[in-house]
Amino acid sequence: MSSDDTTDPTADDESFTDSPVAGLEQSTTTRGSGRTVISARNINVWYNETQALSDITMDIPEQEVTALIGPSGCGKSTFLRCINRMNDRIDACRIEGELELHGKNVYDEDVDPVALRRKVGMVFQKPNPFPKSIYDNVAYGLKIQGYDGDIDARVEEALRGAALWDEVNDQLDESGLELSGGQQQRLCIARAIAPDPEVVLMDEPTSALDPVAASKVEDLIDELVEDYTVVIVTHNMQQAARISDKTAVFLTGGELVEFDDTASVFENPSSERVENYITGKFG
């Protein structure tokens, strides 16, 4: 659902019938249950007196990839961090509205942010493995959460899920910091999925990687969505078109001006503002 916009972003315009990204490879996979897992209603966020998000309303579907795109400073990362309450750590941040995970407002007083983050994992822009062994990077969260299952088996499962096991299974005692950048990011993904969350948030996870490593992470995202709901922030239009099922377009002022199937957003943008952004005329 799009927020209000003076240009009426839901209006059809024949001038946008030609795809602004002609020839761009796009995801054609149909997946997901169709159920809503995350529901945002009238989310407004301020940092002190500066408003970062303005009246954001959207429903994120289960077991699909939802891409958040927009120019720098438009609030997409702020919205991502609302989902697992990472913004709680910023004293100057104030949030209004409701953000529900399976119908439960994550900002209710009885919600433990730590427990929430077990259900909503996160992968950051730059790989940030712990200064520990590869094994301990993945096992650490399980141990502090009191996981009573087979930790060795879960570590292997997470590393396989992150497409890393075959590369590191004979060096689990070595430091995660010794891995390549792309391997480190996949290690961070393994760490994020080890507690078996429902949602995986990714804040520009390939922006610090070379093209080959970035491609491996994209392939991995396509596999992860079989088990998890993925929400990814990206500045890369081609990446959003390739890997996502839904795309949300944020523009300056923290407005959500379009949220629709990715093919629709790129082939038939609903407003001139959106077309100008995705074709590189601004942003």
Curated annotation (Swiss-Prot):
<feature type="binding site">
    <location>
        <begin position="70"/>
        <end position="77"/>
    </location>
    <ligand>
        <name>ATP</name>
    </ligand>
</feature>
<comment type="similarity">
    <text>Belongs to the ABC transporter superfamily. Phosphate importer (TC 3.A.1.7) family.</text>
</comment>
<dbReference type="GO" id="GO:0005886">
    <property type="term" value="C:plasma membrane"/>
</dbReference>
<keyword id="KW-0547">Nucleotide-binding</keyword>
<keyword id="KW-0472">Membrane</keyword>
<dbReference type="GO" id="GO:0035435">
    <property type="term" value="P:phosphate ion transmembrane transport"/>
</dbReference>
<dbReference type="InterPro" id="IPR003593">
    <property type="entry name" value="AAA+_ATPase"/>
</dbReference>
<comment type="subunit">
    <text>The complex is composed of two ATP-binding proteins (PstB), two transmembrane proteins (PstC and PstA) and a solute-binding protein (PstS).</text>
</comment>
<dbReference type="InterPro" id="IPR003439">
    <property type="entry name" value="ABC_transporter-like_ATP-bd"/>
</dbReference>
<comment type="function">
    <text>Part of the ABC transporter complex PstSACB involved in phosphate import. Responsible for energy coupling to the transport system.</text>
</comment>
<dbReference type="InterPro" id="IPR017871">
    <property type="entry name" value="ABC_transporter-like_CS"/>
</dbReference>
<keyword id="KW-1278">Translocase</keyword>
<dbReference type="GO" id="GO:0015415">
    <property type="term" value="F:ATPase-coupled phosphate ion transmembrane transporter activity"/>
</dbReference>
<dbReference type="GO" id="GO:0005524">
    <property type="term" value="F:ATP binding"/>
</dbReference>
<protein>
    <recommendedName>
        <fullName>Phosphate import ATP-binding protein PstB 1</fullName>
        <ecNumber>7.3.2.1</ecNumber>
    </recommendedName>
</protein>
<dbReference type="Pfam" id="PF00005">
    <property type="entry name" value="ABC_tran"/>
</dbReference>
<dbReference type="InterPro" id="IPR005670">
    <property type="entry name" value="PstB-like"/>
</dbReference>
<feature type="domain" description="ABC transporter">
    <location>
        <begin position="38"/>
        <end position="278"/>
    </location>
</feature>
<feature type="region of interest" description="Disordered">
    <location>
        <begin position="1"/>
        <end position="35"/>
    </location>
</feature>
<feature type="compositionally biased region" description="Acidic residues">
    <location>
        <begin position="1"/>
        <end position="16"/>
    </location>
</feature>
<keyword id="KW-0067">ATP-binding</keyword>
<keyword id="KW-1003">Cell membrane</keyword>
<keyword id="KW-0592">Phosphate transport</keyword>
<dbReference type="GO" id="GO:0016887">
    <property type="term" value="F:ATP hydrolysis activity"/>
</dbReference>
<keyword id="KW-0813">Transport</keyword>
<dbReference type="InterPro" id="IPR027417">
    <property type="entry name" value="P-loop_NTPase"/>
</dbReference>
